[in-house]
Each structure stands twice: as C-alpha cells, then as structure tokens.
C-alpha cells in the first residue's frame, strides 16, 4: 500500500507540526514529482510560515507541472493579494475559477481585488456569486452589503446588512453601515441613530460612527 504523504503532511500542518509537514510534503513531491498537489501543499505550508518567496516558487512549480491546478493559482493569488498586487491576484483568482476551484472564496477574493482597485461594478457579480454559494457566511454577506451601499444600491444592501445583524448582533460594522444606509437613503433618522449608536457602543473606538451620529443629532435639533 502506497503511503499518502500528502495526507500525513496535511494532518501535521493542521496540528501545527510544521517540520513534520515539510518532511511529508517533500516525500510526496519525491514520490510523485509530476503531480501538482505536493507542490501546492508545500506552498501553502510556506505561506503559513510567512516564507513568501519560497511559497511563490512552489505554487509556480505546481502550475508548470499542471497548468490546470486550480488550487495552485488560488494559493499564488493569495500571496499577491497580501502583497497588494491586486491586478496580478485578480488574474490568478480568475484562472482558479476557470479551472474549477470549489466554494465561494475565490469569487469573494476576486471581488476584493476589484474593490481594492475601486472597480466596484466589476466586483459586484463576483461578490454576489460568493453570497449565493455561501449564504450563511457572515463575512461575505457583510462585504456584499457594503459593496451594494458603495454602489448606492440601498434597497438590495439593506437585507444583507439586516441578515448579518440577525446572525451576529455584536457586529459593529453591520450596524454602522445600516445606520449610514438609513441616514443617506431614508428619512428614518431614528433608525439611523439607533444603528450608529449600536456601532460605537459595541466598538468605542469607532469614531466615524460617533461622528455621523452626532452630525445627525445636530441636524435634527
């Protein structure tokens, strides 16, 4: 029976036994040098250890070995995103999607790349798709709501932010954005103030929430 070095390495990685993981992934690569998965796993390990240059080389090697390795494109995209190389990261997230990567994360990260470049309309379909795939993911639903607010699509943003608050009452960002939504798109200043107050009560250093709350109060007087 063949030893599955990748499984051994992943288990060690999950248990934060990084040296054991590195040894196992090395053995996986030596056993199957023409398979991308060992290189991807080693790249992921190196990225977690903040050895970015070597991680990049392993992801690139995985792509050379198998140009359809979706997880290699995704791992390399994450490195570039963290390095604020958003245009390059976006291309790689697209490739990971083209090659069939599963789940919502690649759609979400591709949307974030476009957001970083202030290309909000380009971000929208990818963030929407992420929310459709992972409807219970609070981070994605909040990001989708904020993006809709940025595009002044308040009618669609409101239920997204309300969902986040229903699921995570202590989410100051959701309260803040819902408060701003009420302030700029409705005449319901009471709800605007309520959610803004919740935001800076939950997070006392949330100066922007307090500033807008005070501004509304002054306007009402």
Per-region residue spans from a language model:
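Structural signature of tandem alpha-helical TPR/SEL1-like repeats
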Residues: 14-27, 49-61, 83-95, 116-129, ...
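Structural marker of alpha-solenoid helical repeat scaffolds
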Residues: 31, 65, 99-100, 133, ...
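Terminal, low-structured helical/coil segments at or just beyond the last alpha-helical repeat
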Residues: 1-4, 8, 181-221
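Short, charge-rich amphipathic alpha-helical segments embedded
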Residues: 27-49
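Position-specific recognition of the canonical hydrophobic site in helix A of tetratricopeptide repeat
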Residues: 6, 13, 40, 47, ...
């Amino acid at each position: 029976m063949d030893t599955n070095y990748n499984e051994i390495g992943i288990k060690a990685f999950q248990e934060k036994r990084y040296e054991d993981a590195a040894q196992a992934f090395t053995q996986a690569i030596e056993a199957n040098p023409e398979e991308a998965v060992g290189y991807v796993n080693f790249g992921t390990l190196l990225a977690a250890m903040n050895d970015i240059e070597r991680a990049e080389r392993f992801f690139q090697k995985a792509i050379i070995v198998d140009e359809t390795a979706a997880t290699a494109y995704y791992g390399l995209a994450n490195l570039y995103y963290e390095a604020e190389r958003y245009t390059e990261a976006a291309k790689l997230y697209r490739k990971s999607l083209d090659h069939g990567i599963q789940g919502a994360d690649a759609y979400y990260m591709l949307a974030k790349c476009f957001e970083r470049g202030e290309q909000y309309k380009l971000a929208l379909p990818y963030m929407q798709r992420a929310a459709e795939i992972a409807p219970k993911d609070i981070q994605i639903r909040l990001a989708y709501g904020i993006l809709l607010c940025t595009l002044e699509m308040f009618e669609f943003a409101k239920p997204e932010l309300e969902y986040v608050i229903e699921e995570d009452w202590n989410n100051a960002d959701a309260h803040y954005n819902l408060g701003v939504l009420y302030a700029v798109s409705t005449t319901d200043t009471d709800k605007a103030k309520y959610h803004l107050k919740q935001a800076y009560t939950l997070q006392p250093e949330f100066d922007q929430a307090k500033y807008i709350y005070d501004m509304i109060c002054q306007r009402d007087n």
